[in-house]
Amino acid sequence: MTTTTQSEQDRVIIFDTTLRDGEQCPGATMTFEEKLNVARMLDDMGVDVIEAGYPFASDGDFEAVHEIAKRSKNSVICGLSRAAHKDIDRCAEAIKPAERGRIHTFLSTSPVHMKYKLQMEAAQVYEMVISSVTRARNHTDDVEWSAEDATRTEFDFLCRCIEAAIKAGATTINLPDTVGYAVPEEYRELFRKVRETVPNSDKARFSVHCHNDLGMAVANSMAGVAGGARQIECTINGIGERAGNAALEEVVMAMRVRQDRLPYWNRIETTMLTHASKTVSAATSFPVQYNKAIVGRNAFAHESGIHQDGMIKNAQTYEIMTPETVGVKGTSLVMGKHSGRAGLIHKMEELGYKLSRNQIEDVFVRFKALADRKKDVYDEDIEALVDEQLLHGQDQIKLMSLTVIAGTHGPQRATMKLDVDGQIRIEEAEGNGPVDAVFNCIKALVPHDAKLELYQVHAVTEGTDAQAEVSVRLSHEGRSMTARAADPDTLVASAKAYLGALNKIVAKRQRSVREDAPAVAVAG
């Protein structure tokens, strides 16, 4: 949205290429339905141009671009095409249903690309630029031309090609840093000099397309805008060839947060950024790194005691944007070995606890001991520490022994001995697999209606003797309880983790009873 301080000349077009360049990332292939879902989300969040695919590459890509073109409500739908006429014609057919369509055609212009990839002379490339843009312009008024590997192209030849492309009808000129070779000052100067040198540069919008091979894709993108570009080509989560592309969420928030140095604006609804990140991550099966800027799990998480103390007093001490701005519910104070008393007290208050000073000291000592042993300390862990302090007891359900018989034939069988509040119980159960047999055994020994929400196993270290760490999450009466356990035997770790979560439910229920909640037994 524009304001009195914003003008159209300061607007930056956001060109998302998640469905094209992003999907070219090895292993990031999306299904037809996933592409439609991502495109719908991009359209809803205010992306100006969606590069929906490369129609000539396959029938599947063509169909996806064609269907997205039919469904788009707000965005320009763009298809990529090589300089060959058959590619351009196929691209034009794919985007035809779009209310606003664009053909994006490209050709390499650097000496190394012309010699080894195209095996063409500069004069031939120049003529092909004119021919391809002219062909594309016969299909649509919105044509983008890219000088592939522009940052390694001889400047005079680059300017000649740009002038010819604009004269042939290109409305957007893209100067990609195809191999992530440029540095910000160099890239800014490239755009400034090109716009000064090319006589008809005012007839087209200039675009940046930066790869992250040296980790400077976002910085280069913003430098290009400072040099006069007014379109940024980017992807959700920065996915793309090799080290990826400039991340949409990062360039958008850089402009929002640093208006003092980056006085540009865009149409992106930033509260959808986290949702967009999760959607693309799910579609591509590419996890988002925890410390990823803007949308990473730790982007608004604080563990250091000093930082937590500052955040409790004033969030601006350690956050330059509010989490709600990007669609995150709030700041997370992550409890761990670096956390201090202030952070623990704040977390306990969030969980509804009010303890005396002596009780807090006791919980804090045991919390620090736990944090030294565990990588992450969750709300449920803190609840368990407090429950132990308030209940003056240990877990009521303890594993005494476990034997599992498994093989290639017949159902698997588990025999388990538990100490349930001082009473020894032994039971045998079958299951569809050894883990199922173990959990069925627990259900037989301790009847309950908690539902299994998560079962996850990973090796703590490498090698065949590695400990298995198992995470189990149980839901009961709208509340989830998570527990982890490690053991060289995966099945023993599984049993311990399940019982750990079940013990937390029991402790939670007992605390509710003390607070005059209805006394409903979880375990019999």
Curated annotation (Swiss-Prot):
<keyword id="KW-0464">Manganese</keyword>
<dbReference type="GO" id="GO:0030145">
    <property type="term" value="F:manganese ion binding"/>
</dbReference>
<feature type="region of interest" description="Regulatory domain">
    <location>
        <begin position="398"/>
        <end position="524"/>
    </location>
</feature>
<dbReference type="GO" id="GO:0003985">
    <property type="term" value="F:acetyl-CoA C-acetyltransferase activity"/>
</dbReference>
<feature type="binding site">
    <location>
        <position position="209"/>
    </location>
    <ligand>
        <name>Mn(2+)</name>
    </ligand>
</feature>
<keyword id="KW-0100">Branched-chain amino acid biosynthesis</keyword>
<feature type="binding site">
    <location>
        <position position="21"/>
    </location>
    <ligand>
        <name>Mn(2+)</name>
    </ligand>
</feature>
<feature type="binding site">
    <location>
        <position position="211"/>
    </location>
    <ligand>
        <name>Mn(2+)</name>
    </ligand>
</feature>
<dbReference type="InterPro" id="IPR000891">
    <property type="entry name" value="PYR_CT"/>
</dbReference>
<keyword id="KW-0028">Amino-acid biosynthesis</keyword>
<dbReference type="InterPro" id="IPR013785">
    <property type="entry name" value="Aldolase_TIM"/>
</dbReference>
<dbReference type="Pfam" id="PF00682">
    <property type="entry name" value="HMGL-like"/>
</dbReference>
<dbReference type="InterPro" id="IPR054691">
    <property type="entry name" value="LeuA/HCS_post-cat"/>
</dbReference>
<dbReference type="GO" id="GO:0005829">
    <property type="term" value="C:cytosol"/>
</dbReference>
<keyword id="KW-0479">Metal-binding</keyword>
<keyword id="KW-0808">Transferase</keyword>
<protein>
    <recommendedName>
        <fullName>2-isopropylmalate synthase</fullName>
        <ecNumber>2.3.3.13</ecNumber>
    </recommendedName>
</protein>
<dbReference type="InterPro" id="IPR013709">
    <property type="entry name" value="2-isopropylmalate_synth_dimer"/>
</dbReference>
<comment type="pathway">
    <text>Amino-acid biosynthesis; L-leucine biosynthesis; L-leucine from 3-methyl-2-oxobutanoate: step 1/4.</text>
</comment>
<dbReference type="InterPro" id="IPR036230">
    <property type="entry name" value="LeuA_allosteric_dom_sf"/>
</dbReference>
<dbReference type="InterPro" id="IPR050073">
    <property type="entry name" value="2-IPM_HCS-like"/>
</dbReference>
<comment type="similarity">
    <text>Belongs to the alpha-IPM synthase/homocitrate synthase family. LeuA type 1 subfamily.</text>
</comment>
<keyword id="KW-0432">Leucine biosynthesis</keyword>
<dbReference type="GO" id="GO:0009098">
    <property type="term" value="P:L-leucine biosynthetic process"/>
</dbReference>
<dbReference type="InterPro" id="IPR002034">
    <property type="entry name" value="AIPM/Hcit_synth_CS"/>
</dbReference>
<keyword id="KW-0963">Cytoplasm</keyword>
<comment type="subunit">
    <text>Homodimer.</text>
</comment>
<dbReference type="GO" id="GO:0003852">
    <property type="term" value="F:2-isopropylmalate synthase activity"/>
</dbReference>
<feature type="binding site">
    <location>
        <position position="245"/>
    </location>
    <ligand>
        <name>Mn(2+)</name>
    </ligand>
</feature>
<dbReference type="InterPro" id="IPR005671">
    <property type="entry name" value="LeuA_bact_synth"/>
</dbReference>
<dbReference type="Pfam" id="PF08502">
    <property type="entry name" value="LeuA_dimer"/>
</dbReference>
<feature type="domain" description="Pyruvate carboxyltransferase">
    <location>
        <begin position="12"/>
        <end position="274"/>
    </location>
</feature>
<dbReference type="Pfam" id="PF22617">
    <property type="entry name" value="HCS_D2"/>
</dbReference>
<comment type="function">
    <text>Catalyzes the condensation of the acetyl group of acetyl-CoA with 3-methyl-2-oxobutanoate (2-ketoisovalerate) to form 3-carboxy-3-hydroxy-4-methylpentanoate (2-isopropylmalate).</text>
</comment>
